[in-house]
Protein backbone atom coordinates (compact mmCIF):
# COMPACT_ATOMS: atom_id res chain seq x y z
CA UNK A 1 0.00 0.00 0.00
CA UNK A 2 1.31 3.43 -0.95
CA UNK A 3 0.10 5.96 1.62
CA UNK A 4 -0.42 9.44 0.18
CA UNK A 5 -1.67 10.89 3.46
CA UNK A 6 1.14 13.38 3.90
CA UNK A 7 1.90 14.21 0.28
CA UNK A 8 0.96 17.51 -1.28
CA UNK A 9 -1.33 17.29 -4.27
CA UNK A 10 0.66 17.15 -7.53
CA UNK A 11 0.69 20.56 -9.23
CA UNK A 12 -1.90 21.70 -6.72
CA UNK A 13 -3.25 25.18 -6.25
CA UNK A 14 -5.18 25.92 -3.07
CA UNK A 15 -5.56 22.58 -1.30
CA UNK A 16 -8.30 23.53 1.13
CA UNK A 17 -11.92 24.72 1.02
CA UNK A 18 -12.74 28.44 1.26
CA UNK A 19 -13.17 29.70 4.80
CA UNK A 20 -16.97 29.65 4.95
CA UNK A 21 -17.11 26.04 3.73
CA UNK A 22 -14.23 24.98 5.96
CA UNK A 23 -16.13 26.44 8.92
CA UNK A 24 -19.23 24.42 7.98
CA UNK A 25 -17.19 21.23 7.64
CA UNK A 26 -15.62 21.66 11.06
CA UNK A 27 -18.97 22.57 12.64
CA UNK A 28 -20.68 19.43 11.30
CA UNK A 29 -17.73 17.07 11.75
CA UNK A 30 -18.18 13.47 10.56
CA UNK A 31 -21.98 13.59 10.72
CA UNK A 32 -23.66 12.82 7.41
CA UNK A 33 -27.36 12.84 6.56
CA UNK A 34 -29.67 14.32 3.87
CA UNK A 35 -29.63 17.74 5.54
CA UNK A 36 -25.83 17.84 5.40
CA UNK A 37 -25.87 16.84 1.74
CA UNK A 38 -28.42 19.56 0.92
CA UNK A 39 -26.39 22.21 2.74
CA UNK A 40 -23.24 21.36 0.82
CA UNK A 41 -25.01 21.17 -2.53
CA UNK A 42 -26.12 24.75 -1.91
CA UNK A 43 -22.68 25.91 -0.74
CA UNK A 44 -20.84 24.40 -3.68
CA UNK A 45 -23.44 25.35 -6.30
CA UNK A 46 -22.99 28.98 -5.24
CA UNK A 47 -19.22 28.58 -5.55
CA UNK A 48 -19.30 26.81 -8.91
CA UNK A 49 -21.60 29.30 -10.63
CA UNK A 50 -18.76 31.76 -10.95
CA UNK A 51 -16.34 29.41 -12.64
CA UNK A 52 -14.95 30.19 -16.12
CA UNK A 53 -16.67 28.33 -18.93
CA UNK A 54 -14.46 25.43 -20.02
CA UNK A 55 -13.61 24.66 -23.63
CA UNK A 56 -15.49 21.36 -23.83
CA UNK A 57 -18.34 19.72 -25.68
CA UNK A 58 -20.96 17.60 -23.93
CA UNK A 59 -23.00 14.79 -25.45
CA UNK A 60 -25.88 14.66 -22.96
CA UNK A 61 -28.07 11.75 -21.89
CA UNK A 62 -26.39 9.13 -24.05
CA UNK A 63 -28.16 5.81 -23.43
CA UNK A 64 -25.93 2.88 -22.48
CA UNK A 65 -28.78 0.47 -21.67
CA UNK A 66 -32.57 0.00 -21.80
CA UNK A 67 -33.57 1.62 -18.50
CA UNK A 68 -34.51 5.29 -18.21
CA UNK A 69 -31.57 5.75 -15.82
CA UNK A 70 -29.04 4.09 -18.10
CA UNK A 71 -27.67 7.47 -19.17
CA UNK A 72 -24.31 9.17 -19.33
CA UNK A 73 -22.99 12.57 -20.32
CA UNK A 74 -19.79 12.44 -22.36
CA UNK A 75 -17.51 15.43 -21.82
CA UNK A 76 -14.89 15.85 -24.54
CA UNK A 77 -12.44 18.59 -25.55
CA UNK A 78 -13.90 21.36 -27.68
CA UNK A 79 -11.26 20.75 -30.34
CA UNK A 80 -10.69 17.17 -31.46
CA UNK A 81 -7.38 15.86 -30.11
CA UNK A 82 -4.69 14.62 -32.45
CA UNK A 83 -4.68 11.24 -30.70
CA UNK A 84 -7.10 9.13 -28.68
CA UNK A 85 -7.38 10.13 -25.03
CA UNK A 86 -7.71 8.05 -21.87
CA UNK A 87 -11.21 7.80 -20.43
CA UNK A 88 -12.52 8.38 -16.91
CA UNK A 89 -16.01 7.05 -16.11
CA UNK A 90 -17.49 8.64 -12.97
CA UNK A 91 -20.32 7.11 -10.92
CA UNK A 92 -22.06 9.41 -8.42
CA UNK A 93 -23.12 8.67 -4.85
CA UNK A 94 -26.56 8.82 -3.30
CA UNK A 95 -26.84 6.08 -0.70
CA UNK A 96 -28.11 3.50 -3.25
CA UNK A 97 -31.60 5.05 -3.28
CA UNK A 98 -31.09 8.49 -4.85
CA UNK A 99 -28.62 10.56 -6.82
CA UNK A 100 -28.05 11.64 -10.40
CA UNK A 101 -25.16 12.47 -12.70
CA UNK A 102 -26.06 16.16 -12.44
CA UNK A 103 -27.00 18.07 -9.28
CA UNK A 104 -27.82 21.78 -9.04
CA UNK A 105 -28.36 21.90 -12.79
CA UNK A 106 -25.10 20.51 -14.08
CA UNK A 107 -22.84 22.29 -11.60
CA UNK A 108 -22.06 19.40 -9.27
CA UNK A 109 -20.50 16.39 -11.01
CA UNK A 110 -20.69 18.24 -14.32
CA UNK A 111 -17.92 20.53 -13.08
CA UNK A 112 -15.96 17.51 -11.90
CA UNK A 113 -16.18 16.12 -15.42
CA UNK A 114 -15.09 19.44 -16.92
CA UNK A 115 -12.10 19.56 -14.57
CA UNK A 116 -10.82 16.19 -15.71
CA UNK A 117 -11.33 17.01 -19.39
CA UNK A 118 -8.94 19.90 -18.79
CA UNK A 119 -6.53 17.29 -17.40
CA UNK A 120 -6.49 15.45 -20.74
CA UNK A 121 -9.28 12.90 -20.28
CA UNK A 122 -12.55 12.02 -21.97
CA UNK A 123 -15.06 11.86 -19.10
CA UNK A 124 -18.26 9.82 -18.91
CA UNK A 125 -20.53 11.10 -16.12
CA UNK A 126 -22.83 8.16 -15.49
CA UNK A 127 -26.25 7.66 -13.88
CA UNK A 128 -27.35 4.17 -12.83
CA UNK A 129 -30.43 2.42 -11.44
CA UNK A 130 -31.42 2.80 -7.80
CA UNK A 131 -32.79 0.62 -5.01
CA UNK A 132 -35.29 -0.69 -4.13
CA UNK A 133 -36.26 -1.15 -7.79
CA UNK A 134 -32.70 -2.29 -8.58
CA UNK A 135 -31.31 -4.17 -5.53
CA UNK A 136 -27.89 -5.81 -5.19
CA UNK A 137 -26.05 -6.48 -7.44
CA UNK A 138 -27.70 -4.26 -10.05
CA UNK A 139 -25.61 -1.17 -9.26
CA UNK A 140 -22.44 -3.13 -10.00
CA UNK A 141 -24.00 -4.59 -13.12
CA UNK A 142 -24.79 -1.08 -14.35
CA UNK A 143 -21.14 -0.13 -13.91
CA UNK A 144 -20.22 -3.12 -16.05
CA UNK A 145 -22.88 -2.24 -18.61
CA UNK A 146 -21.55 1.32 -18.88
CA UNK A 147 -17.97 0.04 -19.22
CA UNK A 148 -18.96 -2.31 -22.04
CA UNK A 149 -20.77 0.53 -23.82
CA UNK A 150 -17.62 2.63 -23.57
CA UNK A 151 -15.59 -0.31 -24.90
CA UNK A 152 -17.74 -0.27 -28.03
CA UNK A 153 -18.42 3.45 -28.52
CA UNK A 154 -16.03 5.81 -26.75
CA UNK A 155 -13.67 5.81 -29.74
CA UNK A 156 -16.40 7.72 -31.60
CA UNK A 157 -15.82 10.55 -29.10
CA UNK A 158 -12.03 10.47 -29.25
CA UNK A 159 -11.46 8.09 -26.33
CA UNK A 160 -9.30 4.99 -26.09
CA UNK A 161 -11.32 2.16 -24.48
CA UNK A 162 -8.11 0.31 -23.59
CA UNK A 163 -7.28 3.16 -21.20
CA UNK A 164 -10.46 3.28 -19.12
CA UNK A 165 -10.38 4.29 -15.44
CA UNK A 166 -13.51 3.76 -13.32
CA UNK A 167 -14.17 6.24 -10.50
CA UNK A 168 -16.99 6.18 -7.97
CA UNK A 169 -17.96 8.07 -4.85
CA UNK A 170 -19.87 6.62 -1.89
CA UNK A 171 -22.50 4.23 -3.34
CA UNK A 172 -20.90 4.76 -6.74
CA UNK A 173 -17.54 3.71 -5.32
CA UNK A 174 -19.20 0.67 -3.76
CA UNK A 175 -20.62 -0.33 -7.15
CA UNK A 176 -17.33 0.25 -8.99
CA UNK A 177 -15.44 -1.89 -6.47
CA UNK A 178 -18.02 -4.68 -6.65
CA UNK A 179 -18.00 -4.68 -10.45
CA UNK A 180 -14.22 -4.85 -10.70
CA UNK A 181 -13.23 -6.85 -7.62
CA UNK A 182 -16.09 -9.09 -6.38
CA UNK A 183 -15.44 -12.69 -7.45
CA UNK A 184 -19.09 -13.26 -8.28
CA UNK A 185 -19.51 -10.07 -10.31
CA UNK A 186 -16.27 -9.37 -12.14
CA UNK A 187 -16.58 -9.97 -15.88
CA UNK A 188 -13.70 -12.29 -16.66
CA UNK A 189 -14.33 -11.94 -20.41
CA UNK A 190 -13.80 -8.17 -20.41
CA UNK A 191 -10.24 -6.79 -20.53
CA UNK A 192 -9.24 -5.33 -17.15
CA UNK A 193 -9.66 -1.60 -16.74
CA UNK A 194 -6.60 0.62 -16.50
CA UNK A 195 -7.41 1.65 -12.94
CA UNK A 196 -9.97 2.26 -10.20
CA UNK A 197 -10.55 5.37 -8.09
CA UNK A 198 -12.66 4.45 -5.05
CA UNK A 199 -13.78 7.42 -2.95
CA UNK A 200 -15.48 6.63 0.38
CA UNK A 201 -17.19 3.42 -0.65
CA UNK A 202 -18.69 0.62 1.44
CA UNK A 203 -16.72 -2.58 0.91
CA UNK A 204 -17.90 -4.77 3.80
CA UNK A 205 -21.67 -4.55 4.16
CA UNK A 206 -21.64 -7.24 6.87
CA UNK A 207 -19.72 -4.76 9.03
CA UNK A 208 -22.29 -1.99 8.44
CA UNK A 209 -25.38 -0.82 10.27
CA UNK A 210 -28.72 -1.46 8.56
CA UNK A 211 -30.37 1.91 7.90
CA UNK A 212 -33.23 1.87 5.38
CA UNK A 213 -31.00 2.61 2.38
CA UNK A 214 -28.72 -0.37 3.13
CA UNK A 215 -31.74 -2.65 3.49
CA UNK A 216 -33.22 -1.27 0.27
CA UNK A 217 -30.14 -2.28 -1.74
CA UNK A 218 -28.77 -5.31 0.10
CA UNK A 219 -32.05 -6.69 1.47
CA UNK A 220 -33.19 -7.27 5.03
CA UNK A 221 -31.62 -10.73 5.40
CA UNK A 222 -28.34 -9.96 7.14
CA UNK A 223 -27.21 -13.57 6.67
CA UNK A 224 -26.74 -12.73 2.97
CA UNK A 225 -24.45 -9.77 3.63
CA UNK A 226 -21.19 -11.72 3.81
CA UNK A 227 -21.54 -13.04 0.25
CA UNK A 228 -22.49 -9.56 -0.96
CA UNK A 229 -19.44 -7.86 0.59
CA UNK A 230 -16.64 -7.12 -1.86
CA UNK A 231 -13.83 -7.36 0.69
CA UNK A 232 -14.99 -10.85 1.74
CA UNK A 233 -15.27 -12.09 -1.85
CA UNK A 234 -12.30 -10.62 -3.67
CA UNK A 235 -11.61 -12.14 -7.05
CA UNK A 236 -8.16 -13.56 -7.65
CA UNK A 237 -5.57 -11.17 -9.04
CA UNK A 238 -4.02 -9.57 -10.86
CA UNK A 239 -5.81 -6.43 -9.72
CA UNK A 240 -5.98 -3.10 -11.55
CA UNK A 241 -4.08 -0.18 -10.04
CA UNK A 242 -6.20 1.55 -7.40
CA UNK A 243 -6.47 4.89 -5.64
CA UNK A 244 -8.57 4.49 -2.48
CA UNK A 245 -9.56 7.81 -0.91
CA UNK A 246 -11.50 9.06 2.09
CA UNK A 247 -11.97 12.44 3.76
CA UNK A 248 -10.76 13.58 7.16
CA UNK A 249 -14.35 14.14 8.27
CA UNK A 250 -15.87 11.08 6.61
CA UNK A 251 -18.01 8.95 8.93
CA UNK A 252 -15.65 6.46 10.57
CA UNK A 253 -17.08 3.43 8.74
CA UNK A 254 -15.93 4.75 5.35
CA UNK A 255 -12.40 5.33 6.64
CA UNK A 256 -12.34 1.87 8.23
CA UNK A 257 -13.58 0.17 5.05
CA UNK A 258 -10.99 1.95 2.91
CA UNK A 259 -8.18 0.97 5.28
CA UNK A 260 -9.39 -2.64 5.41
CA UNK A 261 -9.64 -2.94 1.62
CA UNK A 262 -6.20 -1.39 1.10
CA UNK A 263 -4.66 -3.75 3.69
CA UNK A 264 -6.31 -6.84 2.22
CA UNK A 265 -5.27 -5.98 -1.33
CA UNK A 266 -1.72 -5.36 -0.13
CA UNK A 267 -1.71 -8.79 1.53
CA UNK A 268 -2.76 -10.26 -1.84
CA UNK A 269 0.14 -8.61 -3.65
CA UNK A 270 -1.51 -5.47 -4.99
CA UNK A 271 -0.17 -1.98 -4.31
CA UNK A 272 -3.18 0.33 -3.90
CA UNK A 273 -2.60 4.00 -3.21
CA UNK A 274 -4.35 5.22 -0.04
CA UNK A 275 -5.26 8.91 0.09
CA UNK A 276 -6.71 10.76 3.08
CA UNK A 277 -8.13 14.13 2.07
CA UNK A 278 -7.62 16.72 4.81
CA UNK A 279 -10.26 19.28 5.72
CA UNK A 280 -13.16 17.67 3.85
CA UNK A 281 -16.25 15.62 4.64
CA UNK A 282 -18.18 12.88 2.86
CA UNK A 283 -19.59 15.15 0.15
CA UNK A 284 -17.23 18.12 0.03
CA UNK A 285 -14.44 15.69 -0.92
CA UNK A 286 -16.18 15.37 -4.31
CA UNK A 287 -18.24 18.55 -4.68
CA UNK A 288 -15.13 20.76 -4.55
CA UNK A 289 -13.59 19.30 -7.72
CA UNK A 290 -13.80 22.07 -10.31
CA UNK A 291 -13.31 24.90 -7.81
CA UNK A 292 -9.98 26.50 -6.92
CA UNK A 293 -9.63 23.92 -4.12
CA UNK A 294 -7.42 21.13 -5.47
CA UNK A 295 -7.48 18.74 -2.54
CA UNK A 296 -8.47 15.72 -4.67
CA UNK A 297 -8.42 16.61 -8.37
CA UNK A 298 -4.65 16.65 -9.00
CA UNK A 299 -4.23 13.32 -7.19
CA UNK A 300 -6.83 11.68 -9.45
CA UNK A 301 -5.42 13.33 -12.58
CA UNK A 302 -1.90 12.17 -11.71
CA UNK A 303 -3.14 8.64 -11.00
CA UNK A 304 -4.97 8.51 -14.34
CA UNK A 305 -1.90 9.76 -16.17
CA UNK A 306 0.24 7.12 -14.47
CA UNK A 307 -2.06 4.16 -15.19
CA UNK A 308 -3.69 5.25 -18.47
CA UNK A 309 -1.14 7.57 -20.04
CA UNK A 310 -1.79 10.95 -21.62
Question: Model regions: which residues?
Answer:
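Alpha/beta-hydrolase superfamily serine-hydrolase fold, recognizing
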Residues: 2-310
Amino acid sequence: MVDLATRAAPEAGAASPPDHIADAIRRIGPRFDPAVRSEFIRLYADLLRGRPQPATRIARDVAYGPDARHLMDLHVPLHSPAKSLPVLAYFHGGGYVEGHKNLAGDLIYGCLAEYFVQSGLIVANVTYRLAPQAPWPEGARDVGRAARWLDDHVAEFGGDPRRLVLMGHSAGGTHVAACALHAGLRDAKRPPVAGLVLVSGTFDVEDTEQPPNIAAYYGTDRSSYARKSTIRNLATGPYPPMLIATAEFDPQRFRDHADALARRLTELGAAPERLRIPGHNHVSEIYHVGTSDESLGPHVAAFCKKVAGS
